[in-house]
Amino acid sequence: MAKPSYVKFEVPQELAEKALEAVEIARDTGRIRKGTNETTKAVERGQAKLVIIAEDVDPEEIVAHLPPLCEEKEIPYVYVPSKKELGAAAGLEVPAASVAIIEPGKARELVEDIAMKVKELMK
């Protein structure tokens, strides 16, 4: 299946798994924002340290604004294959189209590592 139009670069499986792990750790030891509305607000306010976007969001328009907004605000973002997995990592029983890590907590080094790898992928 073709990637949705809002997916601007290919994310290796290992990096996607690290992003989900970072969400879980930040959920427990820091602060996250769950869902596209909360994520958008966190990006607009410059609070997000890392934005995680699911690749299987339908309709695409729900999250299509996030990559350009993150680029404008210079906030790193990464894709994960499944909104169901992203929701679970965020501690939800429902899928989440996107999540923003506000305070990484004990995931700080992991978030910094992901941000660095994402910069390489975007070149």
UniProtKB/Swiss-Prot annotation:
Subunit and interaction comment: Part of the 50S ribosomal subunit. Probably part of the RNase P complex.
UniProt KW RNA-binding keyword: yes
Lineage, broadest ranks: Archaea, Methanobacteriati, Methanobacteriota, Thermococci, Thermococcales
Task performed by this protein: Multifunctional RNA-binding protein that recognizes the K-turn motif in ribosomal RNA, the RNA component of RNase P, box H/ACA, box C/D and box C'/D' sRNAs.
Pfam families hit by this protein: Ribosomal_L7Ae (PF01248)
Species for this entry: Thermococcus kodakarensis (strain ATCC BAA-918 / JCM 12380 / KOD1)
SUPFAM superfamilies: L30e-like
An annotated GO cellular component: cytoplasm
UniProt name for this protein: Large ribosomal subunit protein eL8
Any GO BP annotation: tRNA 5'-leader removal
Top-level division of the source organism's lineage: Archaea
Keywords: Cytoplasm, Ribonucleoprotein, Ribosomal protein, RNA-binding, rRNA-binding, tRNA processing
Similarity section: Belongs to the eukaryotic ribosomal protein eL8 family.
One GO MF term attached to the UniProt entry: structural constituent of ribosome
Subcellular location: Cytoplasm
